[in-house]
Structure formats: C-alpha cells, structure tokens
C-alpha cells in the first residue's frame, strides 16, 4: 500500500512541480519563522542570573507632570528611566546593600600602540556597585571601589575585546589608556562576558547590542 501511495505522489510531483516547489518553500519558511520565534522567546524568557534575580530591582518613579497644558495626563504609564535628580537622590540615600546609576557614553580611544588607529568606543558609566550586583567575570585585576568613586579616580575596567585590541590580550592592569581628553589607569580586565539580552539595561534599547567596550566611574 505504501508503495502505491509513493507512486501516486511521484506522479503528482512530476505533473505539478511548480506548485509542489511553492508548497515545500512555504512549509520551509513557516518552520524557519517558528524556530526564530521560539529562539527569541527562549532567550527573552530565560533567567540570566537565577541565583539572585529575586534581589535585583529596577527602580521606576513617576516624574511626569500631573497635567499637560492644564489637562490631566492621558497616558498613565510611568517613564522607563529615572531623571538625573531622582537617581542622584536615591543613590545618596544609600538604602540598598548595592545600588548603581548607569548610562552609555561614546569616547574617542587613542591607543599607545601606534599600529592601532584611534577609534570611537562605547563605555558604560556606572558605580563600583555595578560589579558585585551583576557579577561580570574578571580575567585580570578587579573592579574599582566605592572610595575610588568618591575620589573620582580616573580608573577603568576593560572588556576582553578592548584589552585584546589595545594590549594584545596581556595583563594590562596598571597600564594607561587615553579616552577622550583624559588618561585612565586600567584596574581590571573582564573575561568574555556578553549577556543577551543585556538584563542590566533593557529599557534604553540596547538589550541585544554588543557589550560595552570599557567601564568608567560615573562620578568622573
């Protein structure tokens, strides 16, 4: 019986090969779209740091004006990010064991190695507490301290890719690097770390972008 149905299928394929090709392509596209959706769902629904995700909180405050042009505000949603004033006051209150403000900024990198041309790189400006909160692994050295935050120390933590580019992957702790108009001392170098989505900054549109190339104290 199977052989008979296989013979009928072969005859149908030969007689309507264009339609058969279109049907196979449609099924293939459907499977591809399904697998893409399932992959994105898996990545978005996973817990990137399960041992402490129940103790990490993103703070939201309603900083909108209560009225707009004399009329009640129609959109009841809160802003996705804090104002600088609100974030600064929360940080100064120091109510959490670890807490940090952060944002991304672009700098011109001027390598000491003349064989490496200057280029623009993206940094994350943050506090020392960023590192114990989100636990990026270190290959060399370590993070700066709260005291160095207060001192506005010109120190930096490099990503693995940046350390490879500037120093050939060597232990660069103690070396100098120039970002913009200032020189910074390398205090630590991360091991490979590129979480997707970037769970520590999902509200600013960078959740699936490449990781920052270095980290600087926000107090600078």
What is each stretch, according to the model?
Residues 1, 8, 23, 32, ...:
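Amphipathic alpha-helical recognition patches that constitute DNA-binding helices
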Residues 2-14, 86, 90:
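A short amphipathic helical element positioned immediately N-terminal to and/or at the very start
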Residues 16-48:
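Short, strongly hydrophobic transmembrane alpha-helices
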Residues 18, 95-96, 171:
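Glycine-centered tight turns that cap/initiate beta-strands
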Residues 24-28, 56, 176:
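Residues at or immediately flanking beta-strands
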Residues 38-165:
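Structured, solvent-exposed hinge/loop segments at the ends of secondary-structure elements
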Residues 128-144, 154-220:
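Mid-to-C-terminal secondary-structure elements
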């Amino acid at each position: 019986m199977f052989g008979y149905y296989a013979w009928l299928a072969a005859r149908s394929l030969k007689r309507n090969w264009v339609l058969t090709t279109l049907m196979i392509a449609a099924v293939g596209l459907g499977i591809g779209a399904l697998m893409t959706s399932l992959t994105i769902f898996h990545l978005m629904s996973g817990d990137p740091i399960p041992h402490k995700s129940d103790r990490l909180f993103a703070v939201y405050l309603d900083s909108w004006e209560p009225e707009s042009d004399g009329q009640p505000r129609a959109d009841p949603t809160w802003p996705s990010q804090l104002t600088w004033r609100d974030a600064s006051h929360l940080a100064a209150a120091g109510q959490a064991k670890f807490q940090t403000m952060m944002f991304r900024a672009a700098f011109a990198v001027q390598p000491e190695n003349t064989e490496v041309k200057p280029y623009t790189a993206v940094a994350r400006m943050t506090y020392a507490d960023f590192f114990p909160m989100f636990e990026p692994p270190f290959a060399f050295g370590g993070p700066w301290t709260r005291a160095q935050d207060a001192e506005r120390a010109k120190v930096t933590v490099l990503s693995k890719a940046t350390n490879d580019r500037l120093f050939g992957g060597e232990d660069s702790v103690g070396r100098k690097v120039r970002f913009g108009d200032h020189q910074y001392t390398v205090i630590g170098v991360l091991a490979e770390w590129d979480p997707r989505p970037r769970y520590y900054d999902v509200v600013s549109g960078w959740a699936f972008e490449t990781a920052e190339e270095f980290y600087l104290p926000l107090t600078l």
